[in-house]
Design a protein with these regions (language model features):
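Active-site beta-strand/loop signature of hydrolases that rely on acidic residues for catalysis
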Residues: 81-88, 103-128, 194-197, 213-239, ...
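N-terminal, active-site-proximal structural segment of metallo-dependent hydrolase catalytic domains
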Residues: 31, 52-54, 59-62, 70, ...
Length: 305
């Protein structure tokens, strides 16, 4: 279930495809003949259908009727995706007790397609050598992808993604953090990119990180989502800067921290502007009522397209 990513990363490799992608259907190429019409089906097909007729009107009528029948039998399905962000504090709750089952239940009950996780230990002494992301992946039956931010306590500490769909590829991008090194984890899926980060407590580093993330998003031809613990309130200058590049999908009026009695919102889910945003609609957005499993409450957004 684990997909480790490279320790460092610079330039993203070129994307294979752009926009929202779906399995490509076979093209129908029509070529006129003297006494009728020839239809060649391609790619991957050697079948040729010859229709002999006096004119093209009958052929066009039959083609339209066949298309209408196909769409009636196999209508185009709109997509829907549920995104989450959760600072899990390494599976440790407000009671100071580490309980992976409790954390996993909070996630599983929401039935997300993809989850951005922050504050994950991997093989540290304080976690008894256990891998927090792997523990949660096993309990939620989701695929886990991890990115180290720092070496810590005999292991590492970082961020991760849980997803129903196995990522096509992933990338680890170091971000500035003078008090603690930060990281961006990018995962490409069939229809979109989904990313997670946990930004610095230093405003200058946060602003620099936002500019870096926006530059990376601009290179991606698919819709680009990013979620995480930004350590920033909605009225902060870096969040205002973020809004220049990204659309805020989650509700900043709903508080996320501290989990017991939330007083501020510092956890967000965003979508990069200009990446087919007109096709996406927010169906649901809320902060999940989870006061005990971590010191943050998780954020959930469901989008349709």
């Amino acid at each position: 279930r684990m997909r480790p990513v490279p320790e460092t990363g610079n330039e993203l490799p070129p994307l294979l495809s752009g926009g929202l992608t779906y399995p490509e259907g076979e093209k129908i190429l029509c070529k006129k003949r003297e006494r009728g019409t020839r239809i060649t089906c391609s790619p991957g097909s050697n079948t040729e259908l010859f229709t002999e007729m006096k004119g093209n009107k009958r052929f066009i009528f039959r083609l339209c009727a066949a298309a209408a029948l196909f769409l009636n039998l196999f209508p185009l399905q709109a997509g829907e995706c549920t995104l989450m962000s959760y600072n899990v504090k390494n599976g440790t709750g407000m009671d100071g007790r580490r309980d992976y089952d409790r954390t996993a239940r909070v996630i599983a009950e929401e039935k997300p397609d993809v989850v951005a996780l922050q504050e994950l230990d991997q093989g540290t002494i304080r976690s008894g050598g256990r891998d927090t992301l792997q523990e949660l992946a096993a309990r939620t039956t989701l695929t886990g992808t991890y990115a180290k931010a720092i070496d810590y306590s005999g292991g590492s500490y970082g961020v991760g993604i849980l997803s129903r769909e196995k990522p096509l590829r992933v990338k680890r991008i170091p971000l500035p953090g003078r008090e603690e090194a930060r990281v961006l984890l990018m995962a490409e899926f069939r229809d979109y990119w989904f990313c997670v980060t946990h930004l610095s407590l230093t405003r200058e580093d946060s602003s620099a990180s936002i500019d870096m993330i926006a530059a990376l998003a601009a290179k991606c031809s698919k819709p680009f989502f990013i979620a995480g613990d930004f350590n920033l309130t909605p009225d902060s200058e870096p969040i205002t800067r973020m809004k220049k590049y990204f659309i805020l999908l989650s509700d900043p009026a709903q508080k996320t921290f501290p989990a017991g009695h939330p007083k501020e919102c510092i956890d967000y889910i965003w979508m990069y502007r200009g990446k087919k945003t007109e096709a996406f609609h927010v169906k649901e957005r809320r902060v999940i009522e989870a006061p005990a499993a971590s010191d943050h409450r998780p954020v959930k957004v469901t989008v349709s397209y």
